């Protein structure tokens, strides 16, 4: 069911960098009620700029590192819910691309996303009297087919796709819907220089950028279109300036 973002309260994890920042700018054109940006690094200049895009929207920045214990995330979310009373959408966008940092890549790209999602279920889960909500998780096309020189990063993104697809199937129980947006190669600082696993390909960034890419602005525009389409369980591919729903092939079924 299509979703109007007018007067919605949105929490955006990692909404200040790369794809996140251009998506934030696009969201602000939609007359949200509140946009709460949770990010590890404060950038007052950018926050001030964002506040001028649409004075109707209240933009709030709160420092947040997705690798903190889940108890800390729950405390932070409680302060947000106490202030706003309700949150309509959670966007999980934290991510790093550096296969030298194996544990941190998993912690930021996957564990942090799972913990933030699990924490907000305390407030949304209809079994606890919650109103439900919408989760938008940022994956990557590498979650479909890996960039094999960065298997750790690619593996975390495959995990995000599977985790989110499971959340979508649990919506009748929890009242919380979910989908992934999966950008292709996008011209951001993330891909300009990064390390391959065990240095198997020292020129991996240069070789990747030799292929067709997209701007973060084009990606952000399609990102918001996907949010407005609001399809539970969707696996969106945002590549080369296009938006496409992926039909996932089923090769096995648990039968439960």
Curated annotation (Swiss-Prot):
Disulfide bonds: none annotated. It holds the Pfam family adh_short. One of its GO terms (molecular function) is alcohol dehydrogenase (NAD+) activity. Coiled coil: none annotated. Keywords: NAD, Oxidoreductase. Its EC number is 1.1.1.1. Substrate binds at residue 140. NAD(+) binds at residues 12-41. InterPro entries: ADH_Drosophila-type, NAD(P)-bd_dom_sf, Sc_DH/Rdtase_CS, SDR_fam. The active site is at residue 153. It catalyses: a primary alcohol + NAD(+) = an aldehyde + NADH + H(+); a secondary alcohol + NAD(+) = a ketone + NADH + H(+). SUPFAM superfamilies: NAD(P)-binding Rossmann-fold domains. GO terms for cellular component: cytosol. One of its GO terms (biological process) is acetyl-CoA biosynthetic process from ethanol. Belongs to the short-chain dehydrogenases/reductases (SDR) family. Homodimer. This is Alcohol dehydrogenase. It comes from Drosophila ananassae (Fruit fly).
């Amino acid at each position: 069911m299509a979703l109007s973002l007018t007067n919605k309260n949105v929490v955006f994890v990692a909404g200040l960098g790369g794809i996140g920042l251009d998506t934030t700018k696009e969201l602000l054109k939609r007359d949200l009620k509140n946009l709460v940006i949770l990010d590890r690094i404060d950038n007052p200049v950018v926050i001030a700029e964002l506040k001028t895009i649409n004075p109707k929207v209240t933009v709030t920045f709160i420092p947040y590192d997705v690798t903190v214990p889940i108890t800390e995330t729950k405390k932070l979310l409680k302060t947000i819910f106490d202030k706003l009373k309700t949150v309509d959408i959670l966007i999980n966008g934290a991510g790093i691309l550096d296969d030298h940092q194996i544990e941190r890549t998993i912690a930021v790209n996957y564990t942090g996303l799972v913990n933030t999602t699990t924490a907000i279920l305390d407030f949304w889960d209809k079994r606890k009297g919650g109103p439900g909500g919408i989760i938008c998780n940022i994956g990557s096309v590498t979650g479909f087919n890996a960039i094999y020189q960065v298997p750790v990063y690619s593996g975390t993104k495959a995990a995000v796709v599977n985790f989110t697809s499971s959340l979508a199937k649990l919506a009748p129980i929890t009242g919380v819907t979910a989908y992934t947006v999966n950008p292709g190669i996008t011209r951001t600082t993330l891909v300009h220089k990064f390390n391959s696993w065990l240095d198997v390909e020292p020129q991996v960034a240069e070789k990747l950028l030799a292929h067709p890419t997209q701007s973060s602005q084009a990606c952000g525009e399609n990102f918001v279109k996907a949010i407005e389409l609001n399809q539970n369980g969707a696996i969106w591919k945002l590549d080369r300036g296009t938006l496409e729903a992926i039909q996932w092939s089923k090769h096995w079924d648990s039968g439960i």
